[in-house]
Curated annotation (Swiss-Prot):
Entry's Gene Ontology cellular component terms: host cell Golgi apparatus; viral tegument
Name of the molecule in the record: Tegument protein UL51 homolog
Source domain of life: Viruses
Broad class of the protein's primary localization: virion
Post-translation changes: Phosphorylated.
Residues where lipid is bound covalently (S-palmitoyl cysteine): C4
Amino acid sequence: MGNCFVKKISSDIFNSNYQMLYSELSEQEDLLDFLETKYTDFGILKTDILNYERDSETFKTLLQVLPIYKKTKLRYNLIERCLNNCPPHVKDALIIEIMKAKKILETLDVVFMKIMIGEFTICSDNVNQLLNKFSIDQTTLCDMEKINTLIDLDEENSKRLLTEIDPLLHQETGLYQALPNAVTDPPSEQRAATKKCYEGFTK
């Protein structure tokens, strides 16, 4: 984007003075609008936000975090629109991404608030580390859940084959009851809660 200039009126028609307009001005306006919209309901007023603008270090930190928040919010909205109509083989990947985006947005909400009340400052390197941590954690959790699901399916198929293909063996040996985690057994509370979380994103 090129530089913008504003012409200053002068009594001398042969001499024109120009003043460069910096992009930081529009970024600061965006940040002020964002903070006012998001935190007015929490009791942070426009005058409070303007006071933060005078604190250059705090405002600089807020300016660093805002682009990441806006980018993640756009990605979250895009995934949310695609989730309902996407092919089944794509849905699992989108569910992972929307969970990551939601977690990042929630965390950045806390970061904004803590910066606003002066609890701490955060640099761009720390934010990038935070994003990488979420990416790793959420992917790992999803992979673990998929492995657990595959184990469940394998157990169910094994039990079905034993009872349907060789019912006499089952009747004589009681092998079905001896198998761990029978189909009729209720799932553990932790696994049920995890599956419920995933199902919530698919609705």
